[in-house]
Amino acid sequence: MLIPYKRLFILITLINGIVFFKGLTSWNWFNSESIAIYKISRVILFNFTLAILIRQQYVINLLFTIATSVPKHWPLFIRRICAKVYHFGGLHSSSATMGTLWYFVFVWGIYKSLSNNVYQINNPIVIITTLILALLVTIVIMALPKMRAKYHNQFEITHRIGGWSVLILFWVQMLLFVRLESPSIPLWNKLDFWILIVLTASVIIPWLRLKKVGINIDSPSNHVALTSFDYGVTPFAGSSTALSRNPLLEWHSFANVPAPDKTGFRLTISRAGDWTGKFISEKPNKIWVKGIPTAGVGIVDKVFKKVFWVATGCGNGPCLPHLLLNETPSILIWSTRSPEKTYGEALVNEIKNVQPNAIIWNTDEHGKPDLVKLAYKAYKDFNAEAVICISNQSLTQKVVHNMEYRGIPAYGAIWDS
């Protein structure tokens, strides 16, 4: 059974396929002399508009707000579909991929027009167009799941710097075409101009909130950093904040842990790679943040009457704000090594205070549990409507797949970025 992410990818692919078929037939975009490059450029722009806007923080929060506003008395089958809103990344990857494929057609049209002298294409347009194609292909290749996982830092750099470069070159390309096609028509009378304005604003807005803020770090062990922030932002439960020590190169998002009736928030950062390892070891007193708190998978608990949380390691962090808020009755199973020793007695006691019935499984004492079996039993005993898993990729996929195989609504991160 295909996950919603892949269904969205297929949907956008089919829509583009239909447009391509119509272009081949009734719309007559392709003939022996030329290709309708202006119409194709509009299709390209529409695809990239969707790809960029669907990743904009305000758009993401709006999507989650709409999806989680469904009343809890609505039928479960409707609510479980709405809760899959976090699969919106399928729109991003599909429209970006389709936009790149269409750009190949556009480049073909440019070179065909150059040889036939149909649109009076000049060398600057050819150079800019070729550069854009090279950048797009690089971005798409680095975003392939295996490439992204193996070369994540390089993926991030090509996605960010390459994406900015493409946007700038789109502006240059548009101005060159305007000068070639209709120099007397003001820019503001052209749809492409306004689309590029929107896309540029979408990219710039998060960076307008870039700031370096003070932090306090408590490390109960060399495996974790309990990081506190209080710089005037109190995020909502189920959101994340992006952190960086080098804003141009890499960003890492972590689930916010706000507490009711308190300002600021906390993050639970565990040693899971070079960046987090260095962060925990060096304990910086300042860090870069940008944009706004952005909704994530945990917030979908709002559409259910009862939820069962499954967490491993620092996965307790994303669960904790929901447990503290207690808007949705829930129960937690947390599997981790030596909880008090690793995360500190204060955090463990905080969880126990809000979740007296929480199942805290010490893997150092009892070994790794069969979380699927434990989750299913606890789900039935608690009479929950859904399971939310916060863990590593393989375990999250295992729990979500096995729960859904049993007909149980299940949710967890999908590692699409």
In which residue ranges do the predicted regions lie?
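FNR-like FAD-binding dehydrogenase module
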Residues: M1-S417
